[in-house]
Amino acid sequence: MQFIFFGTLFSGLLLVCAVTNDIEDASGETPGIVSQITEEQPHQRQKLYNWDYKDLGTIAFEDIPFPTLQPSQTIDQSENCPEGWIRYSDSCYWVETELLGFAKAERKCSEKQSTLFVANSIDEWEAIRGHSKDSFSSWIGLVRFSHYERSEQLPRWQTEGAVNPSKINWLIKPYSPLVNGWSQLANCAASYKSPASLETASYTYFYPCTYLFYSICERNSTIANSLH
């Protein structure tokens, strides 16, 4: 009888542990896992992270075919950027003033042989963000998709070598995804530029990817070659 009792008790404890490990909060996060990851977590990505629009036909995205790209044009640091583009270091930037969802914004950048803006340094982040439109948010190349971010806190830039995402100006600091708007339906990051001179009035936040915002494209020879 004692053997049966302890065996039943042990089985019950295993069942409780299994159920606890499967519990998720309303956002889809598993409590106690994401919070264990530090903001300095290594964040290595492949050279170009293509989010393949054919696989984005979900609540958050539209099924948008990838554009037909024109032959690559090398951008040399000594050359001027195309008319209307902004130069910083060896890259050119385009501030798109048509209101678009995230997927369409990225597609429009691709048509210009560019990606959504990826900051390689805080200096670049501040310089280019300063050209965005006052009182509006602009899409950038930063996402945190729920199906592959269960075990890490940081969102992903579209290209490698970018600044640690936790270092940019999130609305709530120190950075945590949930307090900065992230949910299963709000996966895409946008940068809001305040008309006020106070720096803390501008911020980065997660939004549903179907929201209509402006966007910032970035283009250089490395990006152009990677898109082909």
Curated annotation (Swiss-Prot):
The keyword Oxidoreductase does not apply. Residues 1-18 form the signal peptide. Disulfide bonds join 109-217, 188-209. The keyword Transport does not apply. One of its GO terms (biological process) is immune response. InterPro entries: C-type_lectin-like, C-type_lectin-like/link_sf, C-type_Lectin_Receptor_IMM, CTDL_fold. It comes from the Eukaryota. Pfam families: Lectin_C. Glycans are attached at residues 27, 220. Keywords: Disulfide bond, Glycoprotein, Lectin, Proteoglycan, Signal. GO terms for molecular function: carbohydrate binding; pattern recognition receptor activity. Gene3D superfamilies: Mannose-Binding Protein A, subunit A. GO terms for cellular component: external side of plasma membrane. Residues 88-218 form the C-type lectin domain. This is C-type lectin domain-containing protein 88. It comes from Caenorhabditis elegans. The gene is clec-88.
